[in-house]
Amino acid sequence: MPVPIIETCRKRKRKPKVYNLQRFGEDGFPIQRNGAFRDQIRVFLRDCAEIEDYDIRGMTVWCTLLSHETKSSLIPLYIVEENVKHSSEPYCDHCRCTGWSNHFVSKRKYHFIIPIDTEWSLPLEDDAFDSQSHVLHGLIHCNGFGHLVCVNGMESGSKYLCGREIVDFWDRLCNSLGARMITVEDLAKKRSVELRLLYGVAYGHSWFGRWGYKFCCGSFGVTKNEYENAIEALGSLEIDQIEFDFGELRQSKEINQVFRYYREMSEGHLKTFRDLLRFMLIIKSHASPQKLLPVTPPLLTDSPHQKRSSRLLLKKSDVADNDKSPKYRNYSTVAANLGSRWPVRRLIFAAEVIVESLKEMKALKQNGMTRQDVRDSARLHIGDTGLLDYVLKSMNNVVVGDVLVRRYVDPITRILHYTIQDLDDAVKAKEPKKKEAVVLEEITPLRILTPLKPGADVYGDLLLLYTNVLLNYPESELVRSATQAILDSKHFIKEWPIWDNNDTVLQFLCRINPSLVDVRSEQTTELPPGELVTVPLQATVYDLKQAIEETFRDTYCILSNFVVTEIDEVEEDMSLIGSCSALTVRGHGIDLESKLKCQGGCDTWMVKCICRARDDDGERMISCDVCEVWQHTRCCGIDDSDTLPPLFVCSNCCEEFAEQQRKVLQPKYEFPSSENVFLLESADDFFGDQRCLGMIFPEENYLL
């Protein structure tokens, strides 16, 4: 795989710069950390990367080659500088969903991308920012705030890098470049297990917690305190209490066997559910496929209903190639086992749209379509590019409707293609030819597989406890709500301290006085972050003002003409303030009319959900057609697999409307209370005799 990259470098008459992946970012390698991210990234691109001979929608692309010391491979790291003023998406959805809607729009974004292995020798495509198939995609704004967008290790298709190696590299890269804060949306899964729930209960933090990522904000109104309480509630469950609560339930026998096995292995040191999960994860990390735990292997027992056979007949072709024949799977089955954040129904619909595009091309006598062409055609019907990328990634040797979908890489262009074949033809092609049979002389009784015993498959034991204890605890609202709170906590953040190891300069964290920019609203209450400004030790107040102006003008769109007039904490003497102090500045030249003001955009939408959410958290929402307030579909009783109704009225507007209708439909006179009834012997006296009305009410009470 690395050869084409080197050949490309030779053709461009430049010597490639190659850096060790495992050492990258450590101890000043390849660059020393001396300042803010906006300065560090420029040094990095100048000294450690080479400009590619193509661009993405007019944006410059750099490439740095990384060598893996144990896999003997070269890995390309692409860096793309996105100019916000010329971007089709100037606002940052990741900022908005992590509570940074009030951050000023920065002038530049830097994308760090390691593509999937099969695309290492290919140029980045125009839709590279939207793809979810990259091994690594990180985004950092020029102010040092950024996001880890996606990580796909060996579980997700990478042949060279596991998830831990990828995040290790990203963490060192961020530290070397002087990143301020990085967020991540933790959707990591191990097959069907949500790792943020499993690791949260076992270790008290998410899978990303080992790199210092902590709770940032929860979806559906979950707070940091609720998240921490939920982790403590589940982790502190007593194992004995769990056994008692499951009682005589069908699955209690298996659960008790797992408890007993690992308790005996730990010599009785496991008391709580956290102790048990942590112990099992430690065992799992040290277990090898060749050497299982010292327990009975998977039982293979004879079936009493099968006739024994002393000989097994196999075709010659099967003996040689029984593992090489392709396996066709129905895509509905594949989609159901993917564990995707999209509903299965949407995955199947997207697959059907893709197949229709391939059928249209086949009708024109074209032999297949490139991945990009398929994607572009499907986008006419489905706007969610992330969904399309996810489905395309899983479509190979799958049956959709009456056709078989296959993909292949063109050996010349190295471009991925998709083709379809009628199912009948595919079945005929798969049927083996009749060949002479050979006899295997060994006696092979027919056997069936029975369930594993505890300890034979640690992951299977974890899955048993995860499914039953965490997801289906019997009759416990506490466990159910705690589990849901952890699952609804997806956004985590890591903050790097200000680097102050340079004795030759002074650094200050400078923020504009809030009275100059009204960024507060019902959605956001925190002020935008301060910006790191560096000046020499001998700098004067005038020098500091000049440095602040240059920094703000270079970083934020609305501050291109900003002029500093005053620093609240400094008058004339710089010696009164120390390095790393926070400063508040005043001035003029702020473009308050600019659309590129805050990352939340210039729309005046409002979020006010019954779950207490007051800002966009990235979850599915719907707007009331009357009051235009946004609420979560889940909180409104709309399932994720359901389509949005064409007309939606929230419960508050429904209640107001119902109250108005009730007033309209009520009788003209209210039913009298005991205070204003003069004469009333029965209900018939009130409703049946109009002549009594004058005696019943001292005065008329009109409702409208």
UniProtKB/Swiss-Prot annotation:
Disruption outcome: Male sterile that lacks pollen and undergoes an aberrant male meiosis resulting in the formation of two uni- to tri-nucleate cells instead of a normal tetrad, accompanied by aberrant chromosomal organization from diplotene followed by metaphase 1 arrest. After, male meiocytes exhibit signs of apoptosis, including defects in chromosome behavior, cytoplasmic shrinkage, and chromatin fragmentation, followed by cell death before cytokinesis. Reduced expression of several condensin genes in meiocytes leading to defective meiotic chromosome condensation in male meiocytes.
Binding residues for Zn(2+) 1: 609, 611, 632, 635
InterPro entries with a match to the protein in the record: Zinc_finger_PHD-type_CS, Znf_FYVE_PHD, Znf_PHD, Znf_PHD-finger, Znf_RING/FYVE/PHD
SMART domains: PHD
Recorded GO CC terms: euchromatin; nucleus
PHD-type zinc finger segments: 606-656
Subunit structure: Interacts with JMJ16 in the nucleus of male meiocytes, especially on pachytene chromosomes.
UniProt protein name: PHD finger protein MALE MEIOCYTE DEATH 1
